[in-house]
Amino acid sequence: MMNTMSSESKKQKRLSEEVCKELYAKYETPERVIKHCRAVGETGARIASALNKAGYNFDVSLVRAAGLIHDLMRISDNHGEAAADLLESLGYVQEAKAVRNHMRYEFNAPENITETDIFCLADRLVKEDEYVGIDERVDYLIDKPGKTAERTKILIEKREETKIFIKALEIRMGVKIDSLFRNDDSAKKIDRLLKRVEKPARYIGSEKNICKKKPQNKLRFAFAFPDLYEIGMSYMGLQILYNILNKEDEIYCERVFAPAQDMSTLMCEEKLDLFTLETKTSVRDMDVLGFTLQYEMSYTNILDMLSLAGITFKSKDRAEDEPLIIAGGPCAYNPEPLSDFIDVFLIGDGEELLPHFLREYKKSLEKGVSKREFLKSIVKTDGVYIPSFYDVVYNEDNTVKEYVPLIEDAPKRVKRALISEIEDIPFPERPMVPFIDTVHDRAVVETFRGCTRGCRFCQAGMIYRP
């Protein structure tokens, strides 16, 4: 990744907090505005520091100073211009540049971000004197006196643009911006709950041969098995895909399983989000959440897991800053029962399709591309079915009659993804070793895929017929 110093970050005369206090007094800045400025300064500084940990070299003091002084003349007309002119006259050139257009600022492309981008982002995430995030901040602005349909439309458009920009920063930081400001005591909650549940080893992680990575500049993928740990850890496909994905430098695959009823109840009581085993990260903070669909009886568990994670159920209602929800596995060949809840189905063999899909999504996040635009770019790929791009026509007996594409590039028939040679699959040489007995507590060997018999009632026999 780039690690060049921002053009704004060369050291010049820097505005101190003491000078800010003097200017507040001189220009009679209201106390509530001063508190807001301080909150913006600290918010921007925290984001800049997180980016620096990921390899950037931003001037944190400049970001903080711009926040501290940006609303100095809030009670004046064109307060940004007025404050910038004053700062320039005092020799604070960089602060003046950042402050001048902060009300109408257009973010740079993610690869060209500067201290001004970070400060202006922070200003959009703070309401009054506290960090609240982009949704609450925009809702607050929409409901202010003078509300009009046109202003509301503009604010909503700006909110979506800001969310895309935030996602581009988060993929570089390896953490969600919200998590930088969350009073996160999840680890302590988990430790407390483990003493109160049956089989706590289901939730510990740290098994032999698991993968631990630094999350910076990684696409974070939660591999979700919608059933208990001891069932999911028996699944050879999890071992194969976990091994393949974590060999990719730009992807970090972590695991999550459906908690047992005792743990699920306690998580709801303690307001603890569903978390990954490897890093105990909230699943809602992942970039992609992928479910393996092994049997239909697990479908209600998928909804339970979405609920525990705090993720919106229906795909059409899901926000830009929520994870992309994907699903694969044998039941993905009949996607319609879950089509309202899944953004993308990956149909067929996943050993090549899933890494390719995740690599492409990471590129789109880094470029600041919206989810919908990314999905449009990937829709022609074999094995990719995107329910929102199709209208499903049913027969009288409720069987599917046809799929009608709603966008030009969507193929009328989605082809499954296939691996031509099973010998080419990189099976794990060091499989994960569970802490507790699994339902199939033995070594697994895959000799071939499918079935040579081809019985009409058997999915495996029909899917892999030559």
Indicate where each model-derived feature is located.
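Short N-terminal or domain-adjacent regulatory/targeting segments
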Residues: 183-217, 267-275
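Glycine-rich beta-alpha loop elements in corrinoid/cobalamin-binding modules
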Residues: 259-405
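Radical SAM [4Fe-4S] cluster-binding motif and immediate context
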Residues: 420-466
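Core AdoMet radical
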Residues: 223-231, 251-262, 287-299, 442, ...
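A short, charged/proline- and glycine-enriched loop
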Residues: 214-221, 284-287, 438-441
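Divalent metal-dependent catalytic cores for phosphoryl transfer on phosphate-bearing substrates
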Residues: 26-29, 36, 48, 52-148
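Low-complexity, highly charged intrinsically disordered N-terminal segments
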Residues: 221-226, 232-243, 247-260, 265-267, ...
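Charged phosphate-binding loop/patch that engages nucleotide di/tri-phosphates or the phosphate backbone
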Residues: 150-184
